[in-house]
């Protein structure tokens, strides 16, 4: 397990089978879900129960937990993908969250450093993420880390993230 310590901050790769890591994952993700940028609704009891075991079954899923003084304060959930244009793997960041009250302390930056190190170790050509257009604080952070809109040709515009919920 790789660990980075900065002022009692530890970033570790989550073990989905470890009860402490599973509980930390649910705690931080639930705080994110309750935030307006996460939808403003807590995770259902069913999701809370199934989350870690389900992630353990997804090939290429990995997560990093941030703990400050041993307490969970941040999370990044990622999935391996593939870039057809580069014919190489990529890492897609699905969730990045820091507990309210702990933001602005460099926790997200430390999570991104761990993600990018992991991506390089896995031979990824890039790291991708989605962000709500109104999440200005996150967008400022991501831009400061070198992330930006995806576009192939300025005349074609930037990529959009669309979804269709299946029932």
Segments (PLM) and residue ranges:
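Conserved beta-hairpin
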Residues: 61-76
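A short helix-loop-beta-strand connector motif used in the catalytic cores of GNAT acetyltransferases and
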Residues: 53-65, 92
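Residue-level recognition of the GNAT/N-acetyltransferase active site
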Residues: 94, 99, 132
């Amino acid at each position: 397990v790789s660990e980075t310590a900065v002022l009692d901050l530890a970033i570790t790769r989550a073990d989905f089978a470890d009860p402490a890591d599973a509980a930390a994952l649910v705690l931080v993700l639930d705080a994110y879900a309750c935030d307006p940028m996460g939808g403003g609704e807590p995770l259902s009891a069913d999701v809370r129960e199934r989350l870690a075991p389900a992630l353990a079954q997804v090939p290429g899923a990995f997560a990093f937990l941030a703990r400050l003084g041993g307490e969970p304060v941040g999370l990044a959930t990622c999935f391996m993908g593939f870039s057809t244009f580069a014919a190489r793997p990529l890492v897609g960041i699905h969730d990045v969250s820091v507990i309210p009250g702990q933001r602005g302390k460099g926790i997200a930056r430390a999570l991104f450093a761990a993600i990018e190190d992991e991506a390089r170790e896995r031979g990824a050509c890039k790291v991708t993420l989605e962000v709500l257009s109104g999440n200005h604080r996150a967008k400022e952070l991501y831009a400061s880390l070198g992330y930006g809109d995806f576009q192939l040709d300025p005349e074609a515009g930037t990529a959009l993230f669309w979804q269709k919920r299946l029932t």
